[in-house]
């Protein structure tokens, strides 16, 4: 904001500025009046600047100057005033008049400078009159093309099938028994697991049908083959029995199970000894099984493979299916009533149950025929609106709802050529009937039956053609008008004969079909649009040709220039047009005159302004007349009667010049003149918006199910197996002996080093005693141990009886007991003599004894007794020490003394009992 002092100064200067402006305007008005006065007297002066400004000479053809109403424009800013050649002043009134004219000329020169073109590209052209050396004619009208229309379009309903990559799923039942053998070692204060053996054995067929399915029970023993040996395992090392199956603790969405025991049998051993225990757990488990084409095997949710077709059976067709096992491992049970092991109820309807034994388990499943259980193709899309178009030897099925186009041959593809495809006709017919009843029942009629086409990418298109009711009635009326039988509705070629059977191989992506749809959509739209444009363009050109022929008679130059494409001059020579080439003139070499009046003819004026130009910068100045569109005519014969109120705009360079009353007024820019368009708008329909939505051939779940193994389910089942069939919370406590020993150890440990030493000795003895007693009691508590002890006792009693009998015989008759053979011989001789009645030889009938031999026998017996006594004494001396040796020495001395003192005797004397004791 300006300060107050500045405002006061501006208020004082403003009246002075207004006064100066008014004086300048008055002076200009006086000068203009003088100039008009000179022009009224018929003076036509020619003004020329210095030689270096000769190109800016102004030729005023005696026309009147602009009046005050128009007012010549002032000097254009940025253009310097050109110096004028000073004239010799005249004295008096004449001198003042010349001064006024000089000012008027200066203003006119400034105005003319403003008229000059500012754009260097706005060229002027000089077109000489054609001589007829070159003539042209217009072309005759052309025939216009027709817009191509589609042919043989058919509407209908379609059902699209794809390859079935999902496996065949069914429920299978696993029967097996888990055998666990544990070995433990019992310490003084702890129990250590030293061995663990796990195995699985299949359940026999008879036990499945007669025990598990009939009673809901399972036996606790199992006999199976391992390493070519038949072995038997008993649960808890007890005789086998039937145990109830109980539901598992947890389950998965695809499986459930039952078991007989959840506790591991690990018996306590005696301190310092090993003990083994066996656990047999009968498990029945329902799992999901999967089999993929060609259905030669299936895999269980546990990860186990079974190499037999799920459709294998004993029937004629089922027996041809694949089976990798021997015949004795497979059994098919007709009339099998499955039992629900949870509720115990039996199914009301019988099934055919397949049973197969593997080395680890027995698998059972319900047999079903292969057809219609599986189908090699599956329904993908139901299309309510499907357009079929014929393109040469192919059909294109287009669906706007799918934004896809499927290309097929014109010949049909019978579904019988696809293996396991009986479901196609059944599912397609049901889908078509449902769509027709819901949407087309009142408006359309079916044409023939279902048609089958194999599309690119491995898709089977089942198509039902339709026609509207009105079109069907038209066909009937046409047939009646011709008095003919009703013509059959349009049909397609019959399907080819069925060849070798195979399966479809469908691509995972349908992008090619969507691209085909996009291309066909764009092609159809663009071709129709271009066809309409071409036809309309041709018709427009033929219609405009008439206008061109008429317009060339009025302005041949403009018509010829527009037709040839460059500036030419032209004139009509009868029915042809002569042309000549125009010469370009630079804008700075063209000068416009300020008046359009003829000095010699006051009532006649020029119809267009006069100009002066040069072909080159230093060339000679040539007079001409401004034509249309910056054309310079060499003749100045375009005249017209002068009229009052004359106003004209003429193209000059890149703008317009405005003449009023046949005198230059001012310059007008092209932008200041409103434009009226002569173009005809072409109304074209642009492409409609199409959103590409994701279209999946196979969903993520289908791709996941395409594999036989569901690894997530396998891992889930394996990790939950222990939770389902084992008790991991129950703990078996140690024996009381271990608790007693642990308490004693803690007691002695609290007494210090001495107590620990004493405790070790006491604990060792106590543990030994407890172990012996526990071993004996455990051995006796065992049935086998008790039987063995009984047998040992019986054997001991028998041995004692025979020993006692022998001792009694030895005491009664030692010689007979010690020498039974000798006594047997004497008794035999005596019996023989008694039987014969002959007396024995010798006096008195008794055989005489040899006294010498008897004495030798007595001596031998005596010394044998002495030797035995001496051996006993020596043996006792080794144990008793010195006293025993002294006693033995004294005994020897006594014996020797007795032997030397006793005289030899021939009679037999037995050794007395006291003597034998003394020797000992």
Swiss-Prot record:
The chain crosses the membrane at residues 784-804. GO terms for cellular component: host cell endosome membrane; host cell Golgi membrane; host cell plasma membrane; membrane; viral envelope; virion membrane. Residues 61-71 have a biased composition (Low complexity). The keyword Transferase does not apply. Keywords: Disulfide bond, Glycoprotein, Host cell membrane, Host endosome, Host Golgi apparatus, Host membrane, Host-virus interaction, Membrane, Signal, Transmembrane, Transmembrane helix, Viral attachment to host cell, Viral envelope protein, Virion, Virus entry into host cell. One of its GO terms (biological process) is symbiont entry into host cell. Residues 728-781, 740-781 are annotated as: Hydrophobic membrane proximal region. Residues 805-920 are intravirion. Residues 184-190, 269-276 are annotated as: Involved in fusion and/or binding to host membrane. Disulfide bonds join 127-582, 144-538, 218-282, 375-423, 605-642. It comes from the Viruses. A motif (Golgi targeting) lies at residues 863-866. It is a single-pass type I membrane protein. Residues 40-783 are virion surface. Residues 85-98, 876-888 have a biased composition (Basic residues). Belongs to the herpesviridae glycoprotein B family. This is Envelope glycoprotein B. It comes from Saimiriine herpesvirus 1 (strain MV-5-4-PSL) (SaHV-1). The gene is gB.
